[in-house]
Amino acid sequence: MNLIAAVSLLICSVRGFQQNPPIASTRRLILQTSSHPRILTQQTSLFSSTQTNDSKPKNKRRGNKQFNNKKKRKREVGVGKELKNPDEVITWRCFGITVYPDDLGPSLNIDKRKEKRDGSNVPSERSYLTPPVISSLLSRLRIKSEEATDGLPSILQDARVVRRSLDARRRKGSDPKYTYVIDIDLTRQAARNLGLAPQSGKMEILDDKKLKGQDDDIANNAEDSQAKPRIVIVGAGPAGLFCALSLASSGLCTPILLERGQPVETRGKSIGALIHRRCVDPESNFSFGEGGAGTWSDGKLTTRIGRNSGSVRYVLETLVKYGAPERILVEGAPHLGTDNLVRLLRNMREDLRELGGEIHFGTKATKYLIEDGKIRGVEAECVEVNERTKSKLIDSDAREHESFKTFYGDAVVLATGHSARDVYEELHKAGVELEPKGFAVGFRIEHPQRLINEIQYGNDWGGRVFTKRPSTDTVNTEHFEKLSEGTAESHQGTLPVASYRLATDKAFDGEQNRGAYSFCMCPGGQIVPSSTEEGELCINGMSFSNRDSLWANSALVVTVSQDDPILDKYRSHGCLAGLEFQRDIERKAYELGGMNMTVPVQRLTDYVNGEVSSSIPASSYRLGAISAPLHEIYPKPLYNALSYAITEHFEKQMPGFLIEDALLHGVETRTSSPLRLVRNRTTLQAGGVDNLYPTGEGAGFAGGIVSAAVDGLVVANAIKAKFLTGDGDGDGNAFKSSKSIGFDY
């Protein structure tokens, strides 16, 4: 020990033992381990809080940052001092609870085919708390199973899984694993006894302010309103439905929901006619009708807003309330499937009517009544009553089914979706401010699902994928038995059908880099036509809830900016140039397919080589496929960029992706709207038109079911704020959600 340390020890020992002998003894032990002056100064300052004011150094250093952070975290839960509210219950969120599939065993996959139609026996958040998960949670809480006290069961009784995600990244020597996010309700005293403290990425205290709680004051004050404002909502997709439900449940407004398409029961018949008779109903199809385009799609509920945010949680809980499987609250990449959406939408419709809302199906808005910069309502074309169409009107609230009808309202919400091109054209004529924005176009790529399982999980785990559909599972099992020839490791755990996500911002088109990415990946799905007009062909992907088909499909698209040179030939259409470009490509696809809704296809290997396929593999597209030169359908820069992305990026990200059995289908043009309605960031009203509220994907403020639903809620809150306060300007900021919602690509 050097001289400085010895002197300091002597001084501190005298003072320390006079005030607090145990602390002084601890200080002595630390000082004996280091003689460096800087370390000595920092270590001495650690205990300065136990000294009197006179004994504290005048120029106090900040001390060890890590130690101070720990002290700060402890203060947050009352460690080291008397708790003010020891019985107050707080929610702790635990991240990174890891469990391996083999530990879960074959019971991991829940038999979705045995779920009752009313959703009464779907898995709950509690059902995911299996013994391996509990063991991993106890380890995080630093509680050994054999040391569990009588108080432990009560702690676990309030635990619930809020998210489960599969990490199947193939690292050397690493198996797939599930990571859980678990919430636990604990009193402050219990948290202190366990020594819990917030840690970034591991533990946090939740501030549980959910979106549904923001309407309380409005709902309470709604009874005082004399005449309820009538709010016309155009479009019954996620944005329109959630907006209508929010307005109706508040009791403040009467929502009048107009939908050009049909209720899900009748809409299914229209889709059947398209598949079997190749006849496109321009008002009732895969894109238009109750629930929007997402109804006949995969029903993905992923979003970039953040799965753990209150608004997203509220949307998911609302879907469960109306019949969605409870597992969507937990799974890291949840999806509903078309079969679940039909029941859910029917329940949502019935509830909306019970709350006082109106719904008019077969009602297409054709004119927006704007006077003196303010919208007064809409004119709509209604389905005529005759023997052929009478069945379509059984679910409509319209008492008189004229050919045209005017719906007046105090405000109008536009939630029309990105495929309602006639709406953009009508708004443009009416003087509503529109602005072009970037979008993406490309194809649907389809692989046999067993090959995606192999690429993502490897030979050892690919054979452990089970969908509960015997024919599909047999194909997958035989594929991996042939590959391994008995050499694969034996596993008890099971895995879901594999999916993927690919992206690059360096897709070189010959002159510049573009973005290219996969979009709306549908494992165990099928490809369907999503055209809304005769003489055009565009496609989409969909899956049922079981995801048990033999194929996996995804969009492969490349970006187009609003000032892209490839749009120059369409500039005469002004801000609608992107729409005309989409239409042009869809007409070409229709012609390449033989003008009968057959889809033009090309092997992926032939596409990158610029050659027409001499033969094609089987496809999930039910209207037939024909070999065609898809490499010629888009302008050369887009072909170059996508080919470069496939060969130089996607194949390297997923070795085996570029194979002969991969089949491109044309075309995927409607990933998002090429237009955005200008919207005031504070009032959320359309630029230049009072009381007109654009929302959802069609308005350019969302991308996907969840983000569209959240945006619909945000707009509903802005409307309620305006009519509650009587403020003509309104204020969406009162609800802390006035910004545009992020996209999920």
PLM regions and their residue ranges:
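Residues forming the flavin
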Residues: 56-180, 184-296, 300-318, 322-745
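Intrinsically disordered, low-complexity proline-rich segments enriched in Ser/Thr
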Residues: 23-26, 33-35, 59
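Absolute N-terminal positional cue centered near the fourth residue
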Residues: 3-4, 49-51
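N-terminal chloroplast transit peptides
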Residues: 1-29
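Compositionally biased low-complexity segments, especially N-terminal hydrophobic helices
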Residues: 18, 24, 32, 42, ...
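PEST-like intrinsically disordered low-complexity regions enriched in serine, proline, threonine
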Residues: 47-48, 57
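Sec/Tat signal peptide C-region and signal peptidase I cleavage site
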Residues: 14-15, 38, 44-45
